[in-house]
């Protein structure tokens, strides 16, 4: 029996990963991290979506310590989300160490459940400039987890080389485009579905959807060549 852990936020990317994983694995467990995020409504959305789609189980883990250490527009209500990059070249929505912590804890959870894979929706093609979404980082932490726990584990990144339009196409391939569009929460301001239409996350999501809807055949062909 095959088992996977999906790092799950209830957003477009992780929901698309969950939809795909449910067709590939016998047991799919979701893990969501509560780090005091600005858009904490995502935790309730994640609970609802995981239950609705039929995940085997869903664990919500309190990692509030991250909020104390990582100052970001996603962890502080008094820091507006900016479209501009900071002096260090990163967006102010970057939460330092977030994926280091999330993937480490998901790897430990996989050890506990005997899961062979941890699935995360990080992407290097249309990412927001976060260094912990890069393929190089994921491969590095995957190797560290294998060495540190002396157990085979694969961190799977099905969206790594897909752009946002292709991610929409992947949801559509499984007949879930409307579900992902209407039920997920990607917006930094906590608006479900198409979002606030103003934050960087909404811009990325909308541009990808518009591209896919305008060029379905070619985008789907590009997707098929990558998966």
Swiss-Prot record:
Q: What are its cofactors? A: Zn(2+)
Instruction: Decide whether keyword ATP-binding is in the record.
Output: yes
Cofactor, free-text remark: Binds 1 zinc ion per subunit.
Q: Where is the signal peptide?
A: none
What is the main EC category here?
Answer: ligase
Q: Keyword set for this entry? A: ATP-binding, Ligase, Metal-binding, Nucleotide-binding, Queuosine biosynthesis, Zinc
Q: Which reaction does it catalyse?
A: 7-carboxy-7-deazaguanine + NH4(+) + ATP = 7-cyano-7-deazaguanine + ADP + phosphate + H2O + H(+)
Biological processes, Gene Ontology terms: queuosine biosynthetic process
Protein origin, superkingdom: Bacteria
Looking at the keywords, is Zinc present? yes
Q: At which positions is Zn(2+) bound?
A: 187, 196, 199, 202
* Enzyme nomenclature, EC number: 6.3.4.20
Q: Where does ATP bind?
A: 8-18
Gene3D superfamilies given in the database record: HUPs
Q: Name one GO molecular function term.
A: ATP binding
| CDD domains the UniProt entry points to | QueC-like (cd01995)
List the InterPro entries. Answer: QueC, Rossmann-like_a/b/a_fold
The annotated pathway is: Purine metabolism; 7-cyano-7-deazaguanine biosynthesis
State its role: Catalyzes the ATP-dependent conversion of 7-carboxy-7-deazaguanine (CDG) to 7-cyano-7-deazaguanine (preQ(0)).
User: Which family does the entry's similarity section mention?
Assistant: Belongs to the QueC family.
Q: Please state what the protein is called.
A: 7-cyano-7-deazaguanine synthase
Lineage at the top is: Bacteria, Pseudomonadati, Pseudomonadota, Gammaproteobacteria, Vibrionales
List the gene name. queC
